[in-house]
Amino acid sequence: DREYRVESAKMLATVLHGMKGTPYIYQGEELGMTNVPFSSPDDFTDVESRNVCAERRAAGYAEADILASLQAKARDNARTPMQWNATAQAGFTTGTPWYPVNPNYTAINAEQALADENSIFYYYQALIALRKTQPILTQGSFEPLLPDDPDIYAYLRRWNGKTWLVVCN
């Protein structure tokens, strides 16, 4: 979400870290890194992306539809360089990375996140600490609520006489 990137990232983290099981954090997720705005299907370098592109071109798909599909689903988005700071190549390398650095690296990077006490990074730290100190999150039962509501993801966590309600929209 371009307008509510920080709020959306925190909400999705809340959903994930409040659920049962082991939450996994992928590189850059804790910073709210976004997908690179590739402008052409040819910008994608992953083998699977290139195969999908070739198959869809052969099937007569429009370039715009191929691009939209790759932007939403391609693995390339998770393989861009980690955005450490606002220096050249986002502080990832002094050379040329295989994947391009996201152009938003000057605004979204680890150095910036560490300087902002309300950043997504610190929110993740708080969620991880909560999971370590609140057994309801690691041992409690899970009960989904409002399963048919397209705008609200809600559930209960119960354990040892306690109940937590998690509501995200």
Label each PLM-derived region with a short phrase.
Residues 1-169:
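Active-site and adjacent substrate-binding regions of carbohydrate-active enzymes
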